[in-house]
């Protein structure tokens, strides 16, 4: 919509709200039909936009009295960082391919970083000794994570999780998700990240962007 309306290239902030449906079988804490809200911040370079979104998340959790919220944050670096780390992770996991399930094998083939998102206990055990993206991140990326954690230390329970990659391949830079232990197998009710390269990949202008999606019913359910 941003590209169609020729809004790419401008400093813009958008929000949306509406019903959506899941194709896959919903797990505990999820519904077939659900309402989702989203926030997109376009044209703002890394730094201030991240602080604004984290502040919004802290306020939402407080306003809706979310039980035991934890905001997990990570940084995926730049394309070169992701490529180097991806190769290192692939080298580590290849000798243990026979221990991975079918879904994680597909992830390993198409995007090794997505294996970090696996919920399989066996895969998680294998990943305990895997390389960490923190070893490949530039100093500025690590400093941003520490800065966010420090600024909001009294408002949010923030955890730096270097295995957090999110489920969409277009994310670059800062990524995050907020979880609650009360929501079953799928405990993330909010998540997002920076996607600076997506607009140009879809035929629009090259511009920085960051956003998040919020599962609205999870904020209002008992």
Give names to the regions the model predicted.
Residues 1-221:
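TRNA-recognition modules of translation machinery and tRNA-sensing kinases, especially anticodon-binding
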């Amino acid at each position: 919509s941003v590209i169609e309306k020729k809004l790419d290239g401008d400093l813009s902030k958008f929000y949306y709200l509406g019903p959506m449906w899941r194709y896959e079988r919903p797990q505990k804490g999820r519904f077939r039909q659900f309402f989702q809200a989203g926030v997109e911040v376009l044209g703002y370079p890394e730094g201030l936009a991240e602080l604004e979104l984290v502040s919004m998340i802290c306020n939402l959790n407080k306003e809706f009295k979310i039980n035991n919220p934890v905001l997990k944050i990570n940084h995926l670096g730049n394309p070169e960082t992701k490529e180097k780390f991806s190769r290192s992770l692939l080298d580590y996991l290849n000798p243990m391919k026979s221990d991975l399930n079918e879904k994680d094998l597909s992830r390993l083939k198409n995007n090794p970083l997505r294996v970090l998102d696996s919920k399989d206990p066996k895969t998680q055990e294998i990943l305990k000794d895997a390389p960490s993206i923190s070893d490949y991140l530039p100093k500025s990326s690590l400093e941003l994570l520490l800065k966010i954690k420090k600024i909001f230390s009294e408002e949010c329970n923030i955890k730096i999780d270097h295995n957090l990659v999110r489920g969409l391949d277009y994310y670059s830079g800062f990524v995050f998700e907020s979880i609650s232990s009360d929501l079953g197998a799928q405990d993330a009710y909010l998540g997002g990240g920076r996607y600076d390269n997506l607009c140009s990949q879809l035929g629009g202008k090259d511009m920085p962007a960051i956003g998040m999606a919020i599962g609205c019913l999870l904020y209002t359910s008992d």
